[in-house]
């Protein structure tokens, strides 16, 4: 336990919280070609690679992912949620934060139903998360 005098000389440091989705906290000024620290909830980007990835132990699957170059010139790996997708190279996508527990290095999700990404077909429940319109009665 420090004495009062020690705390006066050198106060306690508060913990610095690290961002879980750092690429969303960086903006880009294209006129000055300089990065700014303007954060945003989502970012637009262009898919540079679309493929599948195997998850960590003990899970087994082929998880769909896309490598995306964001509008702030940062390149990140993003997960494509839902069954089936229409993404290919040069597709324009919208990214949100949120990591995938069993895919190392994947810290972002692609928003379904926004920009070039189509919603999930034949989805009846939880449609808003997958960009699916309400089915006709």
UniProtKB/Swiss-Prot annotation:
One protein family per Pfam: Ribosom_S12_S23
Keywords: Methylation, Ribonucleoprotein, Ribosomal protein, RNA-binding, rRNA-binding, tRNA-binding
Family matches, as CDD domains: Ribosomal_S12
Chain positions covered by the region annotation Disordered: 1-21, 33-57
GO MF annotation, one: rRNA binding
GO biological process: translation
Annotated GO CC locations: small ribosomal subunit
Chain positions with 3-methylthioaspartic acid modification: 102
Domain of life: Bacteria
Segment forming the signal sequence: none
Entry similarity comment: Belongs to the universal ribosomal protein uS12 family.
HAMAP family reported for this sequence: Ribosomal_uS12_B (MF_00403_B)
Quaternary structure note: Part of the 30S ribosomal subunit. Contacts proteins S8 and S17. May interact with IF1 in the 30S initiation complex.
Summary of the function given for this chain in its UniProt record: With S4 and S5 plays an important role in translational accuracy.
Protein name: Small ribosomal subunit protein uS12
Originating species: Streptococcus pneumoniae (strain ATCC 700669 / Spain 23F-1)
Gene from which this protein is expressed: rpsL
């Amino acid at each position: 336990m420090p004495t009062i005098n020690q705390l006066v000389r050198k106060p306690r440091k508060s913990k610095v919280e690290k961002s879980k989705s750092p690429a969303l906290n960086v903006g880009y000024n294209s006129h000055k070609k300089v990065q700014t620290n303007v954060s945003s909830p989502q970012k637009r980007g262009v898919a540079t690679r679309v493929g599948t990835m195997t998850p960590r132990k003990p899970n087994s699957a082929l998880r769909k992912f896309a490598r995306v170059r964001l509008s702030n010139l940062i390149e990140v790996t993003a997960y494509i949620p839902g069954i089936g997708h229409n993404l290919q190279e040069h597709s324009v996508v919208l990214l949100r934060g949120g990591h995938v527990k069993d895919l190392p290095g994947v810290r972002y999700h692609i928003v379904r139903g926004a920009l070039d990404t189509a919603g999930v077909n034949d989805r009846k429940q939880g449609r808003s998360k997958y960009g699916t319109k309400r089915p006709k009665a």
